[in-house]
Amino acid sequence: MSIQTDDFAPVPPPKRVVSAAPTSPQEEALERALRPKLLQEYVGQAKAREQLEIFIGAARKREEALDHVLLFGPPGLGKTTLSHIIAAELGVNLRQTSGPVLEKPKDLAALLTNLEKNDVLFIDEIHRLSPVVEEILYPALEDYQIDIMIGEGPAARSIKLDLQPFTLVGATTRAGMLTNPLRDRFGIVARLEFYTPEELSRIVTRSAGLLNAPIDAQGAFEIARRSRGTPRIANRLLRRVRDYADVKGDGRITQDIAQRALAMLDVDPQGFDVMDRKLLEAVVHRFDGGPVGLDNIAASIGEEPGTIEDVIEPYLIQQGYLQRTPRGRIATLAAFRHLGVAPSRQHTDLFGPA
């Protein structure tokens, strides 16, 4: 199968080409077209995939609703993709919404009462549900029932509505912000981890085939190793490298073409861009390697604290360039080496010789 992209409007580049955050509607449409549809097509997340294969198979065999599923991890790792795959594997409908959209209990009630037997309800950013909406959700998850108020004032009364059995799939980048009562109602909890370069190389090769973009193994790996362990970034870089190959080359994506294209995009071999380097430079140069508080870093580089915490930091921490401590962020010796700066005596004592 191949995907024709001529029908898609030109996609403006995101603020950061290595950002794992959702981008423009046009790019999201193309991203949806590249998503795997079934578990057998899904690359990576071996532990979560094995669990889901077993639990989905059991639910399908018994013709029951799958237990409620919580997916958490950094953005861009495939939480939305997995929700679609779960519904497809179960052969049921998927209803999709997000925590901020469900402002009032009636918003959630309207969704729940329209679900058919064993359907999947996907709530992205579930940690952002309001407390009053969350209260309505509890009996729905446990007993497939909701209580709604009819009328107003003294004449108001509560009625109980029965729901069809359904599966809630909740996704969040901040599992720690979920309330304990909500977290406890998920029978299946899966943490999505960053992907290895080898896994991302398989994803890039598959996506290139769908985009009719010739690519060799070295070209795919070059894109993969700079993709920060994130499929969304890998697919975005692939599309930009494909553009470069079409204009500056013969259309084939080789290692040399990928290296030149990614250098033009200012994505270095570690997958760092200008914003990553600004953060590391701020901690190393302005704050002597730390420890430094998140708000101070945010002010010094002109970014929101939440963006730093959710989008920029996770990869730097996972790769060992930054540490979070109770006293603040600390640059590691790897960060000093990456910037070509001699570590301070304090950091040498803390981490050992460079």
Curated annotation (Swiss-Prot):
Domain topic, free-text comment: Has 3 domains, the large (RuvB-L) and small ATPase (RuvB-S) domains and the C-terminal head (RuvB-H) domain. The head domain binds DNA, while the ATPase domains jointly bind ATP, ADP or are empty depending on the state of the subunit in the translocation cycle. During a single DNA translocation step the structure of each domain remains the same, but their relative positions change.
Ligand binding (Mg(2+)): 80
GO cellular component annotations of the record: cytoplasm; Holliday junction resolvase complex
Chain intervals for the UniProt region annotation (Large ATPase domain (RuvB-L)): 5-195
Family: Belongs to the RuvB family.
Record-given protein name: Holliday junction branch migration complex subunit RuvB
InterPro entries: AAA+_ATPase, AAA_lid_4, DNA_helicase_Holl-junc_RuvB, P-loop_NTPase, RuvB-like_N, RuvB_C, WH-like_DNA-bd_sf, WH_DNA-bd_sf
Phylogenetic lineage: Bacteria, Pseudomonadati, Pseudomonadota, Betaproteobacteria, Burkholderiales
EC category name: hydrolase
Role, per record: The RuvA-RuvB-RuvC complex processes Holliday junction (HJ) DNA during genetic recombination and DNA repair, while the RuvA-RuvB complex plays an important role in the rescue of blocked DNA replication forks via replication fork reversal (RFR). RuvA specifically binds to HJ cruciform DNA, conferring on it an open structure. The RuvB hexamer acts as an ATP-dependent pump, pulling dsDNA into and through the RuvAB complex. RuvB forms 2 homohexamers on either side of HJ DNA bound by 1 or 2 RuvA tetramers; 4 subunits per hexamer contact DNA at a time.
EC nos: 3.6.4.-
Assembly and interaction partners: Homohexamer. Forms an RuvA(8)-RuvB(12)-Holliday junction (HJ) complex. HJ DNA is sandwiched between 2 RuvA tetramers; dsDNA enters through RuvA and exits via RuvB. An RuvB hexamer assembles on each DNA strand where it exits the tetramer. Each RuvB hexamer is contacted by two RuvA subunits (via domain III) on 2 adjacent RuvB subunits; this complex drives branch migration. In the full resolvosome a probable DNA-RuvA(4)-RuvB(12)-RuvC(2) complex forms which resolves the HJ.
Subcellular location: Cytoplasm
Residues binding ATP: 34-35, 76, 79-81, 142-144, 185, 195, 232
Binding site for DNA: 324, 329
Xref: CDD domains: AAA
